[in-house]
C-alpha cells in the first residue's frame, strides 16, 4: 500500500485527486454530498483538515479527526480495489437550489485517471458506487440500521455527523 500511495501522490496532478476505500463510497449522491459539504467548509474557512482531499475523506468517514478519517476511509493493505476521486472545480452559489452540478463531469478527467491506474498497475472497473454493510462498518457507523432507512441514508446520516 505504501508503494501504491507513493506512486499515486507522485502521479496526481494536484491535491484535488485522492484515493478512497472502495466500500466507503455508497453512491454518487453520497460522494456529491460529501464534496458539497467539503466545498462549503472551504468557502466558510471551517475545514478541519489542511487540504480539500483530506477534508473530503474526513467527511466521508463521518469524523472530526483527520487521522481516523485516513484509517477508515483511506486505502488499507487488505484492499483490492479503490476509487480514484477528483474533486471538481465548481463554484457554489450561496443558495443550494441555485447550484447545478453536471453529474457527467467525472468524464472530463478520464485520461488522467486511466494514466494513473495504469502506472499503479491497476485496472479500470466499470462499476458505480453501491452502499454496503461492509462500508458502513468500515466508517464505524454506530447507529442501528432500521429497515425503514436505506443503506444509502445511513451513509448520508453518518456523513452529516462530521460537521456536528
Feature locations, PLM:
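Short, intrinsically disordered low-complexity segments
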Residues: 20-46, 128-145
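Short, low-complexity, polar/charged sequence segments that are solvent-exposed and flexible
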Residues: 10-14, 38-40, 103-104
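Ordered, amphipathic secondary-structure segments that act as subunit-interaction surfaces
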Residues: 28-87
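Hydrophobic side chains in well-ordered alpha-helices
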Residues: 4-7, 69, 96-97
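Proteins with a high burden of low-complexity, intrinsically disordered sequence enriched in S/T/G/P/A and R
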Residues: 1, 29, 161-163
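Hydrophobic, Leu/Ile/Phe/Ala-enriched alpha-helical segments that form helix-helix packing faces
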Residues: 8-12, 73, 117
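Long, hydrophobic N-terminal alpha-helical segment
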Residues: 1-23
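Glycine-rich, aromatic-bearing surface loops/beta-hairpins
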Residues: 75-164
Amino acid at each position: 500500500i505504501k508503494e501504491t500511495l507513493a506512486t499515486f501522490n507522485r502521479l496526481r496532478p494536484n491535491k484535488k485527486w485522492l484515493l478512497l476505500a472502495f466500500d466507503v463510497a455508497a453512491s454518487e449522491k453520497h460522494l456529491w454530498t460529501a464534496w458539497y459539504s467539503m466545498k462549503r467548509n472551504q468557502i466558510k474557512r471551517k475545514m478541519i483538515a489542511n487540504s480539500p482531499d483530506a477534508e473530503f475523506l474526513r467527511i466521508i468517514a463521518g469524523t472530526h479527526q483527520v487521522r481516523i478519517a485516513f484509517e477508515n476511509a483511506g486505502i488499507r493493505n487488505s484492499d483490492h480495489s479503490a476509487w480514484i476521486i477528483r474533486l471538481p472545480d465548481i463554484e457554489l452559489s450561496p443558495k443550494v437550489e441555485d447550484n447545478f452540478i453536471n453529474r457527467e463531469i467525472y468524464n472530463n478527467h478520464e485520461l488522467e485517471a486511466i494514466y494513473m491506474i495504469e502506472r499503479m498497475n491497476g485496472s479500470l472497473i466499470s462499476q458505480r458506487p453501491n452502499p454496503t454493510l461492509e462500508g458502513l462498518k468500515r466508517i464505524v457507523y454506530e447507529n442501528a440500521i432500521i429497515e425503514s432507512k436505506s443503506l444509502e441514508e445511513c451513509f448520508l446520516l453518518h456523513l452529516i455527523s462530521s460537521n456536528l
